[in-house]
């Protein structure tokens, strides 16, 4: 068994403007209307996010540009948008995860780093799960951090790395 776990921007729910329940029903409907493997939208992480993709991921332009560099160098690593099937399963699995009574029995020390301004995953869901875990530490980041906490500007990244280092030193020396 692992001595400890660190979860960074954990996907315990997906961020959606229409609510998780409605979004799950919509994804299931769309999955059933055609090829379930077809892309749910064009682009990358979210519909309409093409111009705001960097803001969804990190406020650090140089770290974002580094990612773009690698996409150009190794195009096969670039992910496309999720399929309707992926979305339906993601909504269902995260809903079931959040409701799992075994969360309250996890003895392993867990550190959760959560970006409250995350535009991809539901930070409220992650914070809620952290409250269910008997041995969890929660480190919250505000507007200064987007989804990719470890690819953020140095002050955010440094705070995250310091929290991880202190946690692992204490829990898994």
Residue ranges with predicted function:
Residues 82-102:
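Active-site nucleophile elbow and catalytic-triad environment of alpha/beta-hydrolase enzymes
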Residues 136-173:
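Catalytic active-site module of serine/aspartate enzymes centered on a nucleophile-bearing elbow/loop
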Residues 106, 112-114, 118:
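Short beta-strand/loop motif that positions the catalytic acidic residue
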Residues 1-78:
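Alpha/beta-hydrolase-fold enzymes
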Residues 6, 111-113, 139:
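Hydrophobic/aromatic beta-strand patches that form the interior of the parallel beta-sheet core
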Residues 103-107, 131-134:
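Short, conserved loop/helix-junction motifs that constitute active-site signature segments
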Residues 119-125:
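Conserved alpha/beta-hydrolase "acid-adjacent" motif
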């Amino acid at each position: 068994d692992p001595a400890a776990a660190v979860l960074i921007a954990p996907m315990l729910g997906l961020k959606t403007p229409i609510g998780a329940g409605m979004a799950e029903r919509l994804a299931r409907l769309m999955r059933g209307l055609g090829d379930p493997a077809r892309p749910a939208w064009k682009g990358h992480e979210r519909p309409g996010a093409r111009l705001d993709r960097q803001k969804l991921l990190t406020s650090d332009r140089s770290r974002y540009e580094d990612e773009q560099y690698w996409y150009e160098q190794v195009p096969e690593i670039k992910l496309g948008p999720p399929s309707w099937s992926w979305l339906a399963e993601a909504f269902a699995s995260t809903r079931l995860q959040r409701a799992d009574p075994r969360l309250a029995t996890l003895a392993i020390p867990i550190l959760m780093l959560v970006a409250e301004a995350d535009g991809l995953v539901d930070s409220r869901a992650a914070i809620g799960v952290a409250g269910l875990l008997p041995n969890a530490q929660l480190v919250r980041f505000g507007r200064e951090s987007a989804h990719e906490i470890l690819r953020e500007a140095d002050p955010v990244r440094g705070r995250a790395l310091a929290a991880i280092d202190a946690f692992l030193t204490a829990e898994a020396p």
